Structures are given as C-alpha cells and as structure tokens.
C-alpha cells in the first residue's frame, strides 16, 4: 500500500510539473517571462536546476522564494512538497499574475504570491524556515533585504552559478555572523551550486 501511494504521488508530481511547463510555454508566447522557448530547454535549464534544491528544503514548513520570476524555484518546491507552505515574492506584475494564475490552475493549496519586492521594511505574518532566491542579486544584498524574515533557526538557500563568483560573494560576508556551505548540484551538467547560509 505504501509503495502504491509513493507511485501515485510520484505520478501526480510529474503531471503537475508537466502542466507547469505547459503554462510557462503558453504564457511565454505573449509575455516573455523566461528566456527559454521549448519544453526541452525549460526542463533541462529550469526544472532540473530547481529540483536540485529539493533535498535541502524537504524539512521546512515555510519557505520564501524572493524574486520568483516564473515561479522558479518556488512552484517546483510547492509541487514536490505539498506539506510545505511556499510564498513567492515577485514585484513584476506580469510575472506575479502568471504565478497566481498557475497556482489556481494547478490547484496548489500550499502556494501563495506576494506581488511586491522584499525589502528590509517588509512585514509578513510569519517568519520563514528558508529564504531562497535564484539568479536575483548578490548574496550580501539578498541577506540585507530579507534577513529579518528568517526564523531564529532559519537559513538561506541561494541558487548560484560559478564557484569563483560564489567565493567572491561569501568573502564579503561577516565571518562572525554567518557560516556557509556550498553544495554542487547533481541534476544538471552546468556549473551550478547551492549556497547554504546560516547565522552563527
């Protein structure tokens, strides 16, 4: 019975992911919300890349995805982890509308959209176990704009590219305040990493 449920859940996840990609392609024709134009490109460069964060998010109850764009990685996390409440912030109204529409289309009850920028002045109803961002800004800038939204034991999981650039960015962090771990992603052959940052 347990294996049957696992297969059922896996099939549902695959169906939702496929439907999400179809929504991107459909919306992208008129509004250009991502720089990919084929299902293969989106699956390889976006979906697989975003799925690489999942081993590090599955114990979180509340996640904030800053500058979510087309819902990457926020909607991928919400699809794979129905037990996790995922909030996506996106100040671009067109992209925020796409996320809101996709949440409704896919019937994702654990996902919601915050259609404004995350700033040090932003107040939310809850603190978050994880703050994540993908291709948004420098590490120090992301921390500055969102550290007040992290729970006491919370952490940043930032999706980054080349290791050289990451090393440059972490060198600017306060050593007595933050500790970090760099994880090489396994889902793609591209030079991608996940930067995990916690407060000491």
Feature roles, as predicted:
Residues 28, 103, 150, 170-174:
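Conserved hydrophobic residues forming the short capping helix/wall of the S-adenosyl-L-methionine
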Residues 143-153:
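A short glycine-rich, Lys/Arg-flanked "PGG" loop and its adjoining helix->strand segment in the class I
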Residues 24, 77, 160, 197:
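Residue-level signal for inorganic ion chemistry
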Residues 95-97, 139, 166-167:
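Short alpha-helix immediately C-terminal to the canonical SAM-binding loop
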């Amino acid at each position: 019975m347990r294996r049957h449920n696992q297969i059922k859940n896996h099939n549902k996840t695959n169906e939702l992911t496929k439907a999400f990609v179809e929504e991107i392609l459909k919306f992208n024709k008129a509004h250009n919300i991502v720089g990919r134009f084929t299902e293969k490109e989106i699956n390889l460069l976006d979906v697989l890349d975003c799925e690489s964060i999942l081993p590090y998010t599955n114990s979180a109850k509340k996640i904030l995805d800053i500058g979510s764009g087309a819902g990457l990685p926020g909607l991928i996390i919400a699809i794979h982890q129905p037990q996790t409440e995922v909030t996506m912030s996106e100040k671009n109204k067109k992209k925020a509308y796409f996320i809101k529409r996709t949440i409704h289309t896919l019937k994702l009850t654990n996902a919601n959209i915050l259609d404004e920028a995350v700033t040090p002045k932003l107040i939310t109803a809850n603190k978050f176990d994880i703050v994540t961002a993908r291709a948004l800004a420098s590490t120090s800038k992301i921390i500055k704009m969102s550290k007040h939204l992290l729970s006491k034991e919370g952490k940043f999981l930032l999706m980054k590219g080349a290791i050289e650039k990451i090393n440059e960015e972490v060198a600017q962090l306060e050593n007595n305040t933050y500790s970090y771990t760099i994880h090489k992603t396994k889902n793609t052959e591209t030079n991608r990493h996940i930067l995990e940052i916690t407060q000491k």
